[in-house]
Amino acid sequence: MRHTIFPPIALLITLSYAQSASADVAVATYEHRPAVQNALLTERLDTLLPRLMRETQIDMWLVIAREYNDDPVFLSLVPKPRFTARRTTMLVFFDRGDAGVEKLTVSRYPLGSMYEAAWEGGDLNAQWRRLAEVIAERDPKTIAVNSSDLWPVADGLSHSLYEKLAGALGPTLSARIASAEALTVRWMETRTPAEVEVWQRGVAIARQTIAKAFSSEVITPGVTTVGDVAWFIRTRFEEQGLEPWFHPDVNRQWQGADF
């Protein structure tokens, strides 16, 4: 369709932007990414999480996820490389005050040195019993879980898992269950200085991709469509192993235009 074709002026406008773009930023290979990701996660768990738990007045936080139905925050809490929860994966964070936040996993499969394994294995019923024991031994004031009617990212505990948890804890402990909404949102929105540095590099990669997308390497005036440019951006990210959050959208618009 005619209105999807780039006019020559679009190329002229974007050439100056492309020429001012910085040199290409190197993208780490899949093999080398986990070391960086896990160093950042270790810092977050050791320094950021204790502060956020105290600011939100939560002394115990549970994140429980099932394979193929992850909690939205699950992958932000576990070491890489990892694609999903395994079977039923239970993470327990308990604030011990000056001793720091204890990080436990009550799960069939270990999570490396970041988490202390608190279960030696067994069937699913034994796993829930062990979780209840871990919680009772620590006697928290609040048992925060990911349940929220406002923030989807903080609403990761399914109804069936909630029922399993409440049943395993019994009436006394289950009465302490509360929403971890504030903590979950703070965890997801807060970046450490080291992460900010990485994000800045990510922005540079996005900018250099956009610069190339709007250059003569990609656009032929009167031929290239906005859809072509959008798919170039998408393909470029995919080729670098950088999964986009959403499909790129490219459109033309300016004051006085009749489209």
What are these regions (language model features)?
Residues M1-T4:
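Positively charged n-region of N-terminal signal peptides that target proteins for export
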Residues R234-F259:
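Acidic, glycine-rich loop-and-beta core segments that form the ion-binding/anion-interacting portion
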Residues Q19-S215, V223-E238, L242:
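A composition/biophysics-driven feature that prefers long, compositionally simple stretches
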